[in-house]
């Protein structure tokens, strides 16, 4: 679809909420973090994202959802790729990773007039897309590391006839982060979502999220978000 692009150079994947952005073609954007949740509507072209939901290829008419504190690496295709980033509610809901829109142009038009209405329409009209089966070893490992109880990386590798070093190198090449760091990041986000979305005890959440104790969870969540679990509880009360 044809969209008007602001006349300014874009040297990287800088966030440009509300108005369409032209992504730099054939570019590999290193893993980076976003504190605020947002949705990316692909208006033209395509790109691949490797992040919190695994490795996902998206094209025109599709949407990627990113929760708070998301982290990912992007590979932009050689095609002219245009996206629209829209803010999402800052809460603990678990967004679908990928979705489709029947009429992305309508969301663009709404965003020009009323960004709040555009976000409301997006949330009302998107259709979740089921996750594709992970065929490559790094993507299989990503799915395993996102699980609530993830095995040791070395043990996982041996079962598949690989060394831990081989698996770690392959994973980091695609995801821009080591498997151990990726697992810790996903675990902290999972704990944070439970903290803000439920009234369960913090000690109970720590156990459910796979931490040895509440102190370990507190350090991980504080490192990820900049606030302790207790402060998040006070803020969402």
Located regions from the model:
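Terminal helix-turn-helix DNA-binding modules in bacterial transcription factors
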Residues: 173-214, 218, 224-227, 234-237
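Short clusters of hydrophobic/aromatic residues that line enzyme substrate/ligand-binding pockets
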Residues: 72-74, 179, 229
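Conserved active-site tyrosine of GNAT-family acetyltransferases
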Residues: 61, 66, 167, 211, ...
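N-terminal regulatory/effector-sensing and dimerization cores
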Residues: 2-98
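A short, Lys/Arg-enriched amphipathic alpha-helix from helix-turn-helix/homeodomain DNA-binding modules
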Residues: 116, 120-165, 177, 181-201
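Aromatic/histidine-rich interaction motifs
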Residues: 93-121
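Alpha-helical residues within the helix-turn-helix
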Residues: 155-158, 169, 173, 207-208
């Amino acid at each position: 679809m044809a969209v008007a692009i602001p006349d300014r150079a874009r040297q990287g994947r800088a966030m440009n909420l509300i108005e369409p952005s032209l992504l730099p073609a054939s570019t590999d954007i290193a893993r980076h973090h976003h504190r605020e949740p947002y949705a990316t509507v692909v208006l033209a072209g395509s790109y691949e994202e490797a992040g919190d939901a695994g490795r996902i290829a998206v094209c025109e008419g599709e949407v990627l959802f990113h929760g708070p504190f998301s982290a990912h690496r992007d590979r932009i295709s050689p095609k002219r790729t245009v996206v629209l980033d829209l803010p999402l509610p800052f809460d603990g809901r678990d967004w679908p990773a990928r979705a489709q829109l029947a009429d992305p142009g309508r969301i663009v038009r709404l965003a020009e007039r009323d960004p709040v209405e555009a976000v409301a329409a997006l949330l009302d009209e998107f259709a979740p897309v089921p996750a594709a089966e992970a065929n490559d070893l790094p993507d299989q490992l990503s799915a395993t590391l996102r699980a609530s109880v993830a095995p040791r990386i070395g043990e996982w590798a041996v079962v598949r006839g690989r060394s831990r070093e081989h698996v770690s190198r392959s994973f980091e090449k695609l995801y821009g982060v080591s498997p151990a760091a990726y697992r810790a990041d996903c675990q902290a986000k999972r704990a944070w979502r439970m903290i803000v979305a439920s009234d369960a005890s913090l000690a109970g959440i720590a156990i459910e999220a796979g931490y040895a104790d509440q102190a370990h969870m507190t350090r991980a969540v504080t490192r990820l978000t900049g606030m302790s679990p207790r402060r998040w509880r006070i803020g969402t009360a």
